[in-house]
C-alpha cells in the first residue's frame, strides 16, 4: 500500500506539472486568486471570514449565495463591497461545480472554495495562501 500511496503522489505532481505547462495560469500573485465563499443564510460567520481574509490583504472575494432568505443577510448583501452571485436555486455545497456559469468562470484556474464556517486560525500564518501558491507554482 505504501508504494501505491507514493504512486498517487507522483501522478498528482506530474498532473499539475503538465497542466501548468499546457494551460498556464493567468494568476501571477496569490492575492489575485478568487476566494469563493459558498453561503446560505449565514451572516455572522460570513462577516468573520471576510474580516479575516481582508485583514490579510485578500480582496478578490466572491460570495455564492444559495437562495438565502435571512433578511439581515440580504440587507448586508445590498451594501456588500464584494461580488455576490445569487444562484437560481440552492445547489448546496457543490454549487461551484453544479452551476455551469460559475464553474466555467472559476474552475479553469486557481481558486479557493470555502464555506463561511471555515475560519482561519489566529495561529495560521498571514501568508498561508502565498505559501500554497508558491508550492503549486514550483
Language model regions located:
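Acidic donor-binding segment of Leloir-type glycosyltransferases
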Residues: 52-89
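Short beta-strand-to-loop acidic/aromatic patch adjacent to the donor-nucleotide binding site
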Residues: 107-121
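Structural beta-sheet core signal
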Residues: 35-37, 63, 113
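N-proximal low-complexity "stem/linker" segments adjacent to membrane-targeting elements
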Residues: 2-51
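Conserved donor-nucleotide/metal-binding helix-loop-beta segment in metal-dependent transferases, i.e.
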Residues: 124-138
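Short acidic, S/G/P-rich loop/turn micro-motifs used as interaction or catalytic elements
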Residues: 42-43, 117-121, 135
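Active-site nucleotide-sugar/metal-binding loop of Leloir-type enzymes
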Residues: 94-110
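Preference for well-ordered, secondary-structure-rich cores of eukaryotic proteins
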Residues: 38-39, 66-67, 119-120
